């Protein structure tokens, strides 16, 4: 779909977005999978609206509504709001901490090895290995778990080779929409960076042709379509951009064939069953890094914009977003409820529009 919308001119690959992991976990626990899919489909619609705004007003219009002083703290909240889930899983528990699945000491060792492997590969890896540190961390953690008897292969044996994916269709839930919608801010900002990055590699200006409004529209269309089939949102994959630069292969058609291959793999039942055998501590160790990395992206967003966070206006906006988002503040009126990332994002946008710019204070 993305290649169709962008006229097969951008060699970039769409895959599942890590930015949505935390809100998806919370959404499934709170409202269930169908309602969460509704919120994720709305994220795609948000991309549509942004693409229309960019087409009519230009890319600078987005920065007026969502400047770094808003997007940075919101991205930080996304990474921090479910940090406890990663820690619980690293300790061998379920995400909410209610059930112990693996003895704590054993789980912490496995999580630490998985985390350390991921970090070391990202720092010291060469060539293709540097592009897949998370996969390396999972493989090493999985290998450590095998002799400890923490991997149950019975689901793989029961699964058939050919099987239809478990399609789940969205179910209307306005609260889920309000909670997940602000999360789309981070991938939207990342989208611009990835388009600039792939353009610098191929020496093409994709912001002009086919235009960032087309690339963002294609991203949104793919995200909404994935949600209607029970899948996670998509994002322009930075790892594949790195692979394009490494291999010097700029043909967008290769991305189309890669996408077709990924779709075909979804019909191999044993692959899905094998992924479900990954022990909880392995993913817990990885998620510590993933959620922390999302938070760091938020901090870096403000650093790159050279924001003076001691300026009273900037301090007020950032402080309200982070504390309200992480602290659990909620607003309820009848059946309407707003909390978490959704409330934090809306408060940030409103404060940015309402508070006067004032003078720059060092």
Task: Report each predicted region and the residues it spans.
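Hydrophobic alpha-helical interface/terminus motif in multipass membrane transporters
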Residues: 24-27, 62, 83, 198, ...
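Membrane-embedded helical hairpins/re-entrant loop segments and their flanking transmembrane helices
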Residues: 1, 5-6, 182-252
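Juxtamembrane helix-loop boundaries in multi-pass membrane proteins
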Residues: 8-18, 64-78, 210-217
